[in-house]
Design a protein with these regions (language model features):
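UBL (ubiquitin/ubiquitin-like) substrate-recognition surfaces
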Residues: 2-559
Length: 559
């Protein structure tokens, strides 16, 4: 049955145009959604409706005004949709939601020891750390990598590695909550003068616990050996127990200092951190700066000599602290380690006598020079060539005072055609660095002298090796020094399948013995391994570098 047609058109009866096609409108976006983003489906519908062409006008052309109004409405809606595409930025959290997302922070994955580089762009400018996964990202603006990470993964809490401020992304507001103070302290530890002065007091052998419940002692923590950087670890362990240098690095503000000083200061403060999340630290950040500054002379992938590295490190640290190349004592490094040495040189000439015999004659004049030193090199006697009755090599022993006689001013050392004598001058520095020379190179191989150096950890009298000066030090009075740190070399056999094929029969391993002044106990630090050791066993290893501290006047040695 066919549909009956209408007798009259609706427009003729009502006198109005046909109702125009209404588009979906959004009222007050901020009131309805409270700063949240519209669903993706609704935004897609709005775009689709906005792109539809308007209905054609009727034959009388009575819908032109409606068409213009609809075009204006479409333009307004398109502008509104563009504004609603990005999440809204906020200057402050909503009332009652100031701790939003803080429960997502995972402290067990946070590690601020590595170099601050964006994991996407590798940039070191304006770097933020995600407190949920621990990764580094650059910036926090709408087009930054941290912003995209917050949208894609749903990690919302970030900390600025330079200012230590915490932000929530993508909203962008700063979070001020006392529960975040422990994270800020681990990222950049800061100490008061009273806390630093109490580190070495007797009876202050403090204990601390990491997040996992592991007990550790601040100042005596393991250091990560990334590959072959144990030579660096032992040097930093020794320097971190030199009180004047340590206190200077922990208390001064190095925000405008060169990167070498800034990163060393952060590493030393982390070594002495009593509220650390982990019971060890990683020197990666400082090693990267050292590798860059030394033109890859010292890296984390190749073994180096600790004395060679310490010499380079102290000289560059002296310059970075504003020290002068000509003026002595112009930095903390020189005030702690630098001393004066008198060198007497006498030339030796070879002549033939009447019987055509070669005779050596000493020059009548003796030239005396005063030089400044940072290290005192001690020469070991040559190792014996013969074996004992069991056909084993004899490992000789020599006391420390015997090899120190090089600096008594009487024993001569011959170098080519010159005879030299050495004598220390007053005043001696607060700390002495002894380099026990064990390695020598010839045209073919590097030789190692395994001689054991015996010593007492306390009561080393340096007065016999110093030229008397009554105006500085009383005649006949001892000058006591006590051992602070002892770097020991250990030769370890390599793997037969790898290193033996390459011709390496043994490899070098370094460890550091440091004194805990609070409990008067000795601690051995070898990479991540930290354990106590009796003081009677200190000299059994192959000592290579020693740090001795001058005892203050009136302080009695007891142990």
């Amino acid at each position: 049955m066919a549909k009956r047609q209408a007798a009259e058109a609706l427009e003729d009866v009502a006198g109005i145009d046909s109702p125009s096609h209404k588009k979906s409108r959004v009222g007050n976006f901020h009131e309805q959604h409270n700063g949240s983003e519209l669903p993706l489906q609704q935004r897609f519908e709005q775009h689709s409706l906005a792109d539809e062409p308007p209905p054609p006008p009727d034959a009388n052309g009575e819908s032109k005004d409606g068409e213009e109004e609809k075009e204006d409405e479409v333009e307004e809606e398109e502008e509104e949709v563009e504004r609603m595409k990005a999440p809204l930025r906020q200057d402050a959290p909503l009332e009652g939601f100031d701790d939003l997302y803080l429960d997502t922070i995972n402290r067990s994955v946070l590690d601020f020891d590595f170099e601050k580089l964006c994991s996407v762009s590798l940039s070191n400018i304006n770097v933020y750390a995600c407190l949920v996964c621990g990764k580094y990202y650059q910036g926090r603006g709408p087009k930054s990598h941290a912003y995209f990470h917050a949208l894609e993964v749903g990690h919302h809490v970030y900390i600025n590695m330079q200012t230590q401020r915490v932000y929530v992304l993508p909203e962008g507001y700063e979070v001020k909550n006392k529960s975040l103070e422990d994270i800020k302290f681990v990222s950049d530890p800061r100490y008061s003068k009273e806390e630093v002065m109490a580190l070495d007091r007797e009876g202050k052998g403090r204990k601390a616990w990491a997040l996992g419940g592991k007990e550790y002692s601040p100042g005596f923590v393991g250091m990560n050996n990334i590959k072959e950087n144990d030579y660096f670890n032992v040097v930093v362990q020794a320097l971190s127990h030199v009180p004047p240098l340590r206190n200077y690095l922990m208390l001064e503000d190095f925000s405008t200092a060169p990167e070498l000083v800034k990163r060393l200061s952060i590493l030393v403060r982390k070594i002495w951190n009593p509220r650390a999340f982990k019971s060890h630290v990683s020197p990666h950040e400082l090693l990267q700066e050292i590798s860059l500054k030394s033109n890859k002379r010292f890296t984390l992938t190749a073994q180096s000599d600790p004395v060679d590295f310490l010499s380079w490190f102290l000289n560059n640290l002296h310059l970075c602290l504003g020290g002068s190349k000509t003026k002595p004592g112009s930095s903390m490094v020189q005030r702690v380690f630098q001393g004066k040495l008198k060198v007497e040189s006498q030339a030796i000439t070879a002549k033939a006598d009447a019987g055509d015999r070669l005779r050596f004659e000493e020059a009548a004049s003796v030239q005396a020079d005063v030089n400044r030193f940072m290290f005192l090199t001690l020469d070991l006697p040559t190792a014996p060539l013969f074996q004992d009755e069991l056909e084993r090599n004899i490992i000789p022993q020599v006391p420390l005072t015997s090899i120190l006689s090089k600096y008594d001013g009487r024993q001569a050392q011959e170098h080519l055609n010159t005879r030299k004598r050495y004598r220390l001058l007053h005043p001696l520095p607060p700390f002495l660095l002894f380099h026990i020379k064990r390695f020598s190179k010839n045209k073919f191989v590097e030789e190692r002298n395994p001689t054991i150096v015996t010593f007492d950890a306390r009561n080393l009298d340096m007065a016999p090796y110093v030229e008397p000066n009554p105006t500085v030090h009383a005649m006949g009075e001892p000058i006591w020094y006590d051992l602070v740190a002892n770097i020991v070399h250990e030769a370890v056999r390599g793997k037969e399948d790898v290193e033996a094929a390459a011709g390496a029969s043994e490899r070098k391993v370094w460890k550091c013995q440091v004194l805990d002044k609070g409990s008067q106990e000795w601690v051995v630090c070898q990479d991540l391994f930290v354990e106590k050791t009796p003081k009677e066993l200190l000299y059994l290893g192959e000592s290579y570098l020693q740090v001795w501290e001058r005892r203050r006047e009136g302080k009695k040695g007891k142990r």
